[in-house]
């Protein structure tokens, strides 16, 4: 009738089910329930964080926190990177294992903090750019969140794998690193 439409909204913990909406988008009615098992998962929250790189470039990233995040407890930190990811702030991801990259929902649901920094590249200096983005982001997080600094890890796949392979030659700050397909 031209007065109703379908809508899909999502967030880190909201599956994008179909909703019927009127022309004013008031009182949407959920008409699908495609992921009922999600009620059995501890859902993290996600925050957009901003900090400055060592080169004074304003950066953004995503910080995933466990559902029952407690500032009196110290958490292990996993850092995953591949170019730019902060646009995924409101994206839904199912908590499932991956063959190649860490799933931030799965890790945060198991009491890890997960950081996904954007990497801004200086032409001709990808390794230096990744180092500046990741290390300065880690410095920022250590001041703001309850992180166990002895239990921090890096993970990158493909281009991110190359950056991981280079990062481990530039610092011993991280307890573990996984470079996939560098």
Where are these regions (language model features)?
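Serine-hydrolase catalytic core recognition
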Residues: 2-182
């Amino acid at each position: 009738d031209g007065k109703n439409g379908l809508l899909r909204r999502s967030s880190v913990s909201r599956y994008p089910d179909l909703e019927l909406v009127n022309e004013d988008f008031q009182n949407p009615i959920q008409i699908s329930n495609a992921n009922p098992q999600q009620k059995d998962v501890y859902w993290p929250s996600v925050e957009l964080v901003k900090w400055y790189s060592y080169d004074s470039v304003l950066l953004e990233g995503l910080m995933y926190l466990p559902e029952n995040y407690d500032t009196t407890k110290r958490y292990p930190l996993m850092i995953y990177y591949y170019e730019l990811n902060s646009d995924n702030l409101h994206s839904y991801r199912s908590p499932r294992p991956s063959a190649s990259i860490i799933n931030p929902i799965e890790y945060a649901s198991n009491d890890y903090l997960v950081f996904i920094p954007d990497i801004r590249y200086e032409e001709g200096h990808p390794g230096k750019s990744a180092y500046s983005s990741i290390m300065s982001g880690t410095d920022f997080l250590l001041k703001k969140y309850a992180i166990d600094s002895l239990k921090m890890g890096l993970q990158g796949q493909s281009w991110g794998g190359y950056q991981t392979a280079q990062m481990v030659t530039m610092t011993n700050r991280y307890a573990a690193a996984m470079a996939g397909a560098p």
